[in-house]
Amino acid sequence: MRFKLFVVCALACGFMAFVLANENISTEEFEDQIINAVPEPVKVTKPKAQAEFVEVPKATPAPKKAEADNPKTKPLALQKPTLIPVVHVSSRGTDDILTVAGLKPEKMFGALIMPNDYLGELYDVDNSGYNWDPNNNVAPPTTYSTAAGGYTITAARLAELRSNFMYWYFDKDMYGGRGDYQFDIHASMTQLHKNLNFQLPFYGFRFNYTRLSLNGYLEFSDPPEYLTYPLVFPIKDWPAKRDPSFMGIFFSKCRVGRIYPSDIDQRTPGVYFRVERDLMGRTDRFGVEVRERTMWDIRQGVVGADTFIPKHVVIATWKNVSFAGGIDNSLYTTNTFQMVLATDEVYTYIIFNYAVLNWLSHTEAGGDTTKGEGGVPAYVGFNAGNGTQAYEYNPYSQNMVIRDLANRGWANGFPGRHIFRVDEQILIGSCNKDIDAALLPLTFAPESGNMLGGQVVNITGPCFDPAIRVTCHFDTESVLGTYVDRNRVICVQPYLKAEGYIRFQISVGTQRFKWRGKYFVETPAAATEKIFFTTDDVHKKNPAEIRITWNQYNLTSNANANVMISLWGYRETKIEPQLEYIDVIEASYSNSGSYVITPSNYINRNNINRDMQFGFLQINLTQPDQYSGLAISPVLWSRPIPLAWYMAPQWERQHGKRWARALCDNWIRADRFLRNFAADLPLCPCTLDQAVLDKGRFRPDRECDKDSNPSCLRHRGAIHCVVSGTPVAQGAEQQCCYDRYGFLMLTYDQMWGSRPRRVHNLGKMPWNEASKVPSLSMWFHDMRPFYSCCYWQEEQAVGCETYRFERRPSQDCVAYQAPGIAGVFGDPHFVTFDGTAYTFNGLGEFVLARSVDESNKFEVQGRFEQLPVNYYGEVKATQLTAVAMRGNTTTTIEVRLRPLHARWRYRLDVLADGRRVYFDRESLKFQHFDGVTVYTPTYLLNQSQVVVQFDAGIGVEVVENEGYMTGRVFLPWKFINKTAGLFGNWSFNKLDDFMLPNGQVAQLNLNDLRSIHTNFGIKWMLTDREVPGVGAALFKREFGRMSGYYANATFQPNYVLDPADFLPANRSYDLERAEELCGECMQCQYDYAMTLNRDLAHFTKNYYDTIVNMQAENAVRVVSCGVLQTPRFGRKLSFDFMPGAKVSFECNEGFILIGDQRRECLSNGLWNIPEYGYTECLREVYYTRRVAFIAIGIIFLVICPLMLCIVCGVYRYRQKQLKEDPQWQMPMLPRSRASSARNLRTLNYDDDSDTDASTLKKSRSYDKVYRTNEPLPGKPQIDFPAKKWDLDENDEDVTSSEGEKPKQLGRRSLHSASGTELDQHGSPVDGDHPDEDDDFDEADVHTGTTHPVGYHQPLSPEEADQLHRQQYSPTFSGLDSRTSGASSINYTPQAATQNRFGGVPVLPSNTQYYSRPPSSVNTVPLRTAPTPLTQDTGLPSPPLATSPTPSVQKSTEV
């Protein structure tokens, strides 16, 4: 019995050995026959370090199939064949390949049909005897070399390598090993761990290892224990169930299959794995060939990989694998596929080569046991793992059309080849013919371009046909595509009037636009710079030369191509903006990457577009077909530049030598017709610290950024500038620049100061109208005048000062209002807008801040997840992991914390309306969406800090450090008393911070965490449905994870705040450590005690200190005195405007400073009142004139009034000294001077004064009574000699008897010395008539007027006129009456008061000083009148005197 059992076992073992022998049949002898078909190596002289084809003699016909297949039969000696190129239509492509004449074997059928004929033994053999046939199964030598002067591959050799469908895989090596064959992988061990020793980026993560699985994938983490079909990734129950990270080329349970002895490729079935590292520096032959083949396959197969150079390559091959669960005969039903991984440790590309697919599914997935048909086919795609994201390659994955993988793809022209980019996102590089849906993702690169156009966009999506038209639609513009191959078309982006993300769609033939994507349009001023200016000469007025450079490979790789350099300009004279061609700078020039522009070559140009003052340089190919043989040409644009270097001679001929002034004046006139926009702009912060903290309204200016662009060409002296993040309602933009001391720079002080802009760089919707085009309108309205008014003129020019002071003046910070700030950090801790600090460990999604004002809505929400376990187990605390926000009608922005192992490149994920956006390129640092601007600092590439600015002035900042986030919200003052949420109500009152959704205020104790949790925090939890007062969640939902996945209202965190109260007594070290790390910061101590994580504690303290300092900085009221204008033609020695600042002034040479030389800023925010007037600078000549006029003015305004006052004073003094009769009144006389003189001659009354007070005649009032109060009591009576009493004012020769000075005497008719009175006709009046009144007048009878004593009636007008005609003497002598016959005044010789010629006594009688009684009263003189004296010399004679001698005519009685 035992013998029988032994025989049975022996037979069984023998049978198994036979089966295994057939399964793993050796092909060494067969390979030796093929290799030895050439009896001796052919020695060919080749140049050093260069591979050449081996020229072999013509060979005899190939041996028969039976002889070749029989391992016992030796092949006949073959002559040396000759390699000749022949056109071979391959089943894997249409490329021309090389074959061997006379040795083309017949097609063999079996488990595997190679894509190309097996020609390995006929390729070149090196000195070591190795055959470099691409299909050779023996691995090359492992002698890596990096020495200079190594192997150089030729274009022919590269074409030969790339003509093969499959990459290298070897089952032998030159040292007797198994090559790449993984003999340890079999049914009982389906995977092997492989160390890569380099970083492999994959789906956001990065790995330095992998696991090679027999089941058709490379994995990086453990799969779930049980799989259910169809497979769904990511695993929704993660982390309860494992969610593997893998690359699945054919994810299905497999086993090693078998091959037939008749198969051409007799390499051992199974799994192969090969790694080639450090290819960038290798010079050995195999390393160079692997690098070049992989590089060009990827560059030409995937859009956007034009600069990719592989650093490491992994080749994994599954050869002749069968499905699991099948019968023995099913082992011959096999699939062969290959995965090629290439990475430079930043980008990763994968090539899937499907050679043969004969089965679809294994038995556990429902497939049959014989053919592997039916059931759920294999999974093809990628899974990031850890429950994050996955990509399933549709329509092939888990679908019956999966067998078409071997006939689709068309990457590099091969059916069955599919290429993907997998480092951050999965981007397909192969066409997809069978998929159909309403919206299909379009793969294109680059994903952004200059607004001016010319960007070549490579597009992959549907499978293309050269006979079918392809239309590309960029926003509102459409262009036709250019066919490249079945997998790619090219569209050249047209000129677009838009910015930000626009719709990008294509249609094939007559189909609708169902392939769609988002294309980012870069504004010309912020676009990727492709033409560089080595100096700033292009901005000058008249440069000698301008040097430009560019990357020649941005146009073409053809070194012999020529380029054309042209000049373009822009203007806005109509509603539609005009970007027009100006001139050709160089018609044809070698594409060398540099050129020198000589402006003197264009002096004589007379261009019709000379009104254009700024424009662009454009470089394109002279012959478009030089770009990859296609009739297209890329276009390179410069940044906007001024055009004085080209247009200056033309402007000078048109406007004269002062053409800059003319251009400036034209702009000023036009700008004055436009509306004033400055009132709409936010005010500039006073200091740089305030500007940096105002995250809601201001962002760094690209032109002057302290972190990325400190040159500040148009703001010299500035170290940093900020601009308003979003356009205001009218489209304007604010700019604020700060000097090295952190103070605001003003245009009132210098031309380099802050300048507001009429048009924002982002433009304004709609972008296709004048004054609304991004960048171009800003340059037309704001940048262009800066050059013509200031940069090309003097700073003190009239146009520049008009530009600085009137049209673009800086806005000072007198009324600036710092924003309110609130934040969340740690596990988590909150600081409200009013400064209340508390802790709330909610688990789920909550409202951080929201507006209760319906007109200005905004929402900021946060997601909190539980912290990972620590050494002691579960941590009863949470942390912030995501923030979502939205304005009134703006785009929804979400910022997420990336998984731990996915933070190697990007720290945070940013989603705009659910679509991931990235900020890893300069032109993408600032991205504008509908109503919101998102940017990352220019010095960061890892997206660890993201700032979101809404058009309402709201800002949200999210910062990540070591996996721990903080979120801060910045609000302008218009939201005071209009906020709610976990950040409280901003009212400057801490008592109402805990406002509930219903508007009530919860009265809570900050130390009672349980009460805060249950009575306040949990009330703000979000759900996916709208809740009154709370709202709905804004977060993007992926893979079925709704708000309930994150929320847990029953979560009970630790409610004890002090670590000393909740840490066990045996953990005193942790308590001491917390105090050591945190000091007195309770939030830091709490976080360390809860998590034992030093990083969390450190950044909790850092975030807390930061927000407290921010609130303290913004709480301080900054006092500013505002603008203090610089005098024209002068300067200020300091630009400070803070309290205590003392600013001194100086003038330029040739000018004089007048006014205050120094002003001081007071503590009340006002400049001190000038003591000497407004400060200004005058030219010396003007200053001299001013001084002279001031002196003359002083003379007239000071000395003359002073003299007048002196005269008046003397006059008043003399008036007081005069003696006058109090009873006397001057009779009423006509106003005529002549009449007055005649009347005075007819009057003969006693005057109360002897003479005038001065030579200046003063009008007297003759209706008054003057009293002299004489004689004086106690004084002697003195008799004065008689004098000439009355002279006319024209008698200038009359000399007083008391001196030599001429004296003007009053024109009065005096009484005679005897006291005899005359009537109104000059006749004596008898004083012995007591019954008659002397003062009686006939007119008094009618008027009833009673005149005082001594009043004499004036002459009638007729009498006065008659008397005027007599031409009487000024002395009123008697000669007048003798010579005038018409006069009624008769000379009376008996009159005591007259001489013989009718003269008047010089001095009156002494009776004039006394009051005269009425005529009816007899009076006796007090003393006898002296003898009258006569003076006949020096007095004018009457004109009609008839004296016999001249002495008689000129004499006057004295």
UniProtKB/Swiss-Prot annotation:
Q: Which Pfam families match?
A: AMOP, C8-3_MUC4, NIDO, Sushi, VWD
* Positions in the Cytoplasmic compartment: 1208-1454
Entry-linked InterPro entries: AMOP_dom, C8-3_MUC4, Epithelial_Barrier/Signaling, Ig-like_fold, Ig_E-set, NIDO_dom, Sushi/SCR/CCP_sf, Sushi_SCR_CCP_dom
Instruction: List membrane-spanning regions.
Output: 1187-1207
Record region (Disordered): 1229-1454
Q: Which GO terms describe its cellular component?
A: apicolateral plasma membrane; extracellular space; smooth septate junction
NIDO domain residues are 259-425
- Effect of gene disruption? Homozygous larval lethal. Mutant embryos hatch into the first instar larvae, but die within 1 day. In mutant larvae midgut, a few septa are present at the cell contacts but large gaps between the lateral membranes of adjacent epithelial cells are frequently observed. Mutant larvae lack the three-layered structure of the proventriculus.
Its biological purpose = Required, together with Ssk and Tsp2A, for the proper organization of smooth septate junctions (sSJs), probably by mediating cell adhesion via its homophilic interaction. Also required for the correct subcellular localization of several sSJ components, such as Ssk, cora and l(2)gl, and for the barrier function of the midgut epithelium. Required for maintaining the three-layered structure of the proventriculus.
Write down what this protein is called. Answer: Protein mesh
